[in-house]
Amino acid sequence: RLSVCGTVNDLASMGARPRYLTAGFILETGLSTDVLEPIVCSMAETAKEAGVTIIAGDTKVIEGKGGLYINTAGLGDRAPDCEISAGNLHGGDAILVTGTLGDHHAVILTERMQMKTTLASDCAPLNHLVEALLAAKLPVHTIRDITRGGLATVANELAAASGVSITLSEEALPVREEIKALSGILGLDPLTMGNEGKMLIALPAAEAETALRILRALPYGTEAEEIGCVSTGSGVHLKTLYGGRRRILPLRGEGLPRIC
């Protein structure tokens, strides 16, 4: 599922409608077909959900201990007048997220630590959310899927690319209570924890409520929130619960665990 969603969401973040995927499998010797078959079926189901077709594939077998690697590439089409890009943030834009932060990262971590929780991965194809916003003719400026490095890293990359400042509201950040508790215990920051089914979306503040209404009416967008704004300046800052303001830096080094 992740191999399909990752590529579909990358295309959607560019304002493109995903159409076709190719898949390459590197299989280690000893891999059981009982393991491989459910994975392939999951890919097929996810591709169907996203409305894309897997049109080509290849396999290679290497020495190993029964593991596998999957690589996908995708093709999509994008309207000629689409201006969605990382460097297109404007002063006065509202910053939205399509749902809660850190879910996938937390699930991978708790699984590896053999901790029992009720958390579930948010891995999902998000292209239908983007298509709905564009179908409504909303002037979306920037979209980015929030993956490795979390919201902090994504926001810093976008602010730097656009030459603007982003201010986030701590009060508005959607984070599950379980993830807040886990973060407190392990010394993690939900802002640097990755997702595989969430997006940051920027558009004029006057259109934010319309965009939220559209997102919340669709699967994978029911918990969408407006979390910040764009202004002149540089960097990313957080307005804290106590009225303070602090600088948010991107994740340094390699985030652990690796989420993809």
Regions found by a protein language model. Name each.
Residues R1-L21, C41-E49, H128-A135, T153-N156:
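Small-aliphatic-rich amphipathic alpha-helix that forms the alpha element of a beta-alpha
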Residues R17-I108:
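Glycine-rich anion-binding loops of enzyme active sites
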Residues A23, T53-G57, L96-G99, T142-I146, ...:
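General beta-strand structural signal in soluble alpha/beta enzymes
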Residues E28-G30, L119-N195:
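Active-site-proximal betaalpha loop/short-helix elements
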Residues L203-E209:
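Helix N-cap motif at beta-to-alpha junctions
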Residues T210-Y220:
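Short amphipathic alpha-helices in soluble, non-transmembrane regions
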Residues L218-C260:
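Acidic, Ser/Thr/Pro-rich beta/coil linker or hinge segments at domain junctions
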